[in-house]
Amino acid sequence: MGRKRRVSRRVPPPDARYNSVVLAKFICRMMLAGKKATAVGIMYDCLERIQQRTGEEPLPVFTKALENVKPAVEVKSRRVGGSTYQVPMEIRETRREALGMRWIIGAARRRSGRGMSERLAAEILDAYHSTGTAFKRKEDTHRMAEANKAFSHYRW
């Protein structure tokens, strides 16, 4: 346990085709068993499908979809005097991004469809239009935080 200085957060290199750091992070999160080439192939195929369906540039569609899914607040359990309260807390930007990505990927994996790129494209388009499982999860999180607003003074 070093005590000299804080370690800076490593920023992954941007992806090759779209030169986007956010897309590179998403690809890494989607990867299973270290198969990055497979994850990259799935993601690029997914973005091509998005472009065919919308007729727009796929990267702004992906970015907007991620923005629509990122939560602003979440609830954390806090034990006070023998009872546990769900305390709403604001989320820092890096965690918001990570949760949004995780929810989109999880929803796409649970979706029914032919291939992962098809399911992922459908989920991203749903998130872009503010619908779908990942967006619903964000709404549920916000609703839970709103319901427990009375306990916000227990923040730490």
Curated annotation (Swiss-Prot):
The keyword Transit peptide does not apply. SUPFAM superfamilies: Ribosomal protein S7 (SSF47973). The keyword RNA-binding applies. Pfam families: Ribosomal_S7. InterPro entries: Ribosomal_uS7, Ribosomal_uS7_bac/org-type, Ribosomal_uS7_CS, Ribosomal_uS7_dom, Ribosomal_uS7_dom_sf. One of its GO terms (molecular function) is tRNA binding. GO terms for biological process: translation. Keywords: Ribonucleoprotein, Ribosomal protein, RNA-binding, rRNA-binding, tRNA-binding. One of its GO terms (cellular component) is small ribosomal subunit. It comes from the Bacteria. Belongs to the universal ribosomal protein uS7 family. Part of the 30S ribosomal subunit. Contacts proteins S9 and S11. One of the primary rRNA binding proteins, it binds directly to 16S rRNA where it nucleates assembly of the head domain of the 30S subunit. Is located at the subunit interface close to the decoding center, probably blocks exit of the E-site tRNA. This is Small ribosomal subunit protein uS7. It comes from Treponema pallidum (strain Nichols). The lineage of its organism: Bacteria, Pseudomonadati, Spirochaetota, Spirochaetia, Spirochaetales.
